[in-house]
Amino acid sequence: MATPSLISETEAWKDLKAHLEGIKRTHLRELMGDTERCQSMMVEFDNIFLDYSRQQASPDTINKLYKLAEAAHLKQKIDRMYNGDHINSTENRSVLHVALRAPRNSAICSDGKNVVPDVWNVLDKIKDFSERVRNGSWVGATGKELKDVIAVGIGGSFLGPLFVHTALQTDPEASKNARGRELRFLANVDPIDAARNISGLNPETTLVVVVSKTFTTAETMLNARTLREWISSALGVSAVAKHMVAVSTNLPLVEKFGIDPNNAFAFWDWVGGRYSVCSAVGVLPLSLQYGFAVVEKFLQGAHSIDQHFSSAPFEKNIPVLLGLLSVWNVSFLGYPARAILPYSQALEKLAPHIQQVSMESNGKGVSIDGLPLPFESGEIDFGEPGTNGQHSFYQLIHQGRVIPCDFIGVVKSQQPVYLKGEVVNNHDELMSNFFAQPDALAYGKTPEQLKKENVSEHLIPHKTFTGNRPSLSILLPTLDAYRIGQLLAIYEHRVAVQGFVWGINSFDQWGVELGKSLATQVRKQLHASRVKGEPVEEGFNFSTKTLLTRYLEATSDVPADPSTLLPKI
């Protein structure tokens, strides 16, 4: 008998569907009363503690999810990824971001070639270059040290490095290394973003890192040309070679742009943009800011999870457990979203990065074989650090829609504060909420409890909390470069597990192409209208034509062939 093409056709999927009704009838108050169950839903690896006992699941549910993983050939798919098979079938590519953080003596192959030596050649080049910039042996065109870095990229070339940078800013070791230096990220083609990035900076002390694999990404290259003009108008055209470097594989276009090809840092087709933070995309700007030694610890942390993911049995495998639980929440319980709630301000950019990793990877409507999916896949990811989120969207999470939550806590703060006379210190206050919120979601508050508290009858419906809202808790011992790398890799592999089980390609992103191609048509129309005065006519529907015409009429003062104008703030 042939293997079913869709995971939903397997007996394991059908068994979970049959199991679903019993779980729906069981409140988390009851499930949490079973100590043995709770103990079985706690896993530890390298002092990272995962508690998923507040999921709407019994031990039987978890066992059935293991059966689903087996039916999806999850272990074989993980092995195929590590072996360099072309699991990104629509682009015929390997998926080897694990190679980016592999030790120097490792062997990870793509198309029969060990790619690890290539990775380390680039890492060694980054180490050498970043150290020369940091120690002042590489200087700008006027002889001044380059203390400020603007990394120009978009999507995965921006969100991942920004997450790591923000997390490292308050780490004692990293912040000490970064003293007197500044790292900024320019992503949006909106000129306001360029204005904010160059505000207060001196071109003489600024180094620009342009990140584009092909060196043709429209938004990135327009921003790069804007910064090139900013530098050359102040220092002369020849200064570009000293003040701009590239992360790219297209050396001819790098050279044509004015950047010395020797100052281009490579990455490869087997690295997807949203998985590229451990490549030169992230390692170069982060090393310039914090020093290569700190960034190497980040890579080592990610590698430790890579090893755990590839070797740990499923019942002890943190990314596998997280991925299977997400499949359960989305495709069976019908919860379309997930809140990522780190109780650490240093992780404020985690949710935006994972939003891209998850939604661009798993926002697919067809299987890897091109069959329409008869079930929901992918989830809407969002989040905010605690306790900020509690005063923002937690109202909906507690009394509105059911949204599974990831609570992420850190045992030791990067920046402890102790005030004499306070009942608890600042970090204890933060963590009090970290421990309380999952229970509030799970247990809720019943009308009977409110009556015992003598709450007015008319307020009881408003103060009732239904509870039975799933969450999980991840407790990290610290938040240094190593742990940040671990957290990144946990979420990367979790997303892969979901895609492997759903049977989709988590490593392409055709959904971003249509809007880009339509924007090309609009761009041509804007140019024709500005330069030749042509009206908006053919090729647009009435709505778009109306909006475009209003825009052009309101910006008729924009010159057709303007002289260069740079931001002024």
UniProtKB/Swiss-Prot annotation:
One of its GO terms (cellular component) is cytosol. Keywords: Cytoplasm, Gluconeogenesis, Glycolysis, Isomerase. Its EC number is 5.3.1.9. It catalyses: alpha-D-glucose 6-phosphate = beta-D-fructose 6-phosphate. It is an enzyme of class 5 (isomerase). Pfam families: PGI. It is found in: Cytoplasm. The keyword Oxidoreductase does not apply. SUPFAM superfamilies: SIS domain (SSF53697). GO terms for biological process: gluconeogenesis; glucose 6-phosphate metabolic process; glycolytic process. The active site is at E360, H391, K516. Pathway: Carbohydrate degradation; glycolysis; D-glyceraldehyde 3-phosphate and glycerone phosphate from D-glucose: step 2/4. InterPro entries: G6P_Isomerase (IPR001672), G6P_Isomerase_C (IPR023096), Phosphoglucose_isomerase_CS (IPR018189), SIS_dom_sf (IPR046348), SIS_PGI_1 (IPR035476), SIS_PGI_2 (IPR035482). GO terms for molecular function: carbohydrate derivative binding; glucose-6-phosphate isomerase activity; monosaccharide binding. Belongs to the GPI family. This is Glucose-6-phosphate isomerase, cytosolic 2. It comes from Clarkia xantiana.
